[in-house]
Swiss-Prot record:
Keywords: Mitochondrion, Transit peptide. One of its GO terms (molecular function) is iron ion binding. The gene is NFU1. Gene3D superfamilies: Fe-S cluster assembly (FSCA), Scaffold protein Nfu/NifU, N-terminal domain. The lineage of its organism: Eukaryota, Fungi, Dikarya, Ascomycota, Saccharomycotina. GO terms for cellular component: mitochondrial matrix; mitochondrion. This is NifU-like protein, mitochondrial.
Length: 256
């Protein structure tokens, strides 16, 4: 569920260049393996309102078009993906890696990025991203035709997501991408990103937060489904296996 609880990192880092002092803070997210990094002065990484950029450590071609991503993946082993928002950076790490081993380096790289004001991605990034697809994977999305009336419903859904739902998710270091609405089944298709990826509470957020709100305001909405790529599906299955294994071990120890 949306927590939107911000906790300051214990060791903020300052970076001074010839013009200004940059102060970076870290905020916790509902996902213990994701942290949100941002400037206390509101320094921007992208134009406000821009669509968040997600880069995984396996996206070699995309990494080559982002100096910040190159440096983070090279100098911070264990970082699985990063999401660049308009004024924040969300880092997802491997659950076996401790934040203390990578957080200072990430903060240092981000402070330098903001201090020098360089573009976070190259001009060719979006063209490469479109050519690559979503992480090199083909995501199965049903195709459906919309009448003029259906288009109005779809626009209403998108407006609700952008104005009522997306701000809360961005605050927690994630993002949401509206992929469409099937008028025949009433199904809304969404893609969660950033801190929402591989988060144990993402399904709760989806069903009891997003789905409930959309159903309340739009009668035509019957269900909300999250679109995932193969890597996300595998990660969630492995997480479920681990939870069951831990629960089984706990029960066994109690029996003894």
């Amino acid at each position: 569920m949306f927590k939107s609880v911000a906790k300051l990192g214990k060791s903020p880092i300052f970076y001074l260049n010839s013009q200004r002092l940059i102060h970076i803070k870290t905020l916790t997210t509902p996902n213990e393996n994701a942290l949100k990094f941002l400037s206390t002065d509101g320094e921007m990484l992208q134009t406000r309102g821009s669509k968040s950029i997600v880069i995984k450590n396996t996206d070699e071609n995309l990494i080559n078009h982002s100096k910040l991503a190159q440096q983070i993946f090279l100098q911070c082993p264990g970082v699985e993906s990063l999401m660049i928002g308009d004024d924040f950076l969300t880092i997802n790490k491997d659950r076996m890696v401790h934040w203390n081993s990578i957080k200072p380096e990430i903060i240092d790289l981000l402070t330098k990025q903001l201090a020098y004001g360089e573009d976070v991605i190259s001009k060719e990034f979006h063209a490469v991203q479109e050519e690559e697809g979503e992480g090199g994977y083909k995501i199965n999305m049903p195709k459906f035709e919309l009448t003029e009336e259906d288009e109005e419903v779809s626009e209403l859904i998108e407006e609700l997501i952008d104005t009522r739902i997306r701000p809360a998710i961005l605050e927690d270091g994630g993002d949401i991408d509206y992929r469409g609405w099937d008028p025949k089944t009433g199904t809304v298709y969404l893609r969660l990103q950033g801190a929402c990826t591989s988060c144990s509470s993402s399904e709760v957020t989806l069903k009891y937060g997003i789905e409930s709100m959309l159903k309340h305001y739009v009668d035509e909405v019957k269900e909300v489904i999250q679109i995932m790529d193969p890597e996300q599906e595998i990660a969630l299955k492995e997480f479920d296996k681990l939870e069951k294994k831990l629960e089984s071990s706990k029960n066994t120890s109690h029996e003894k």
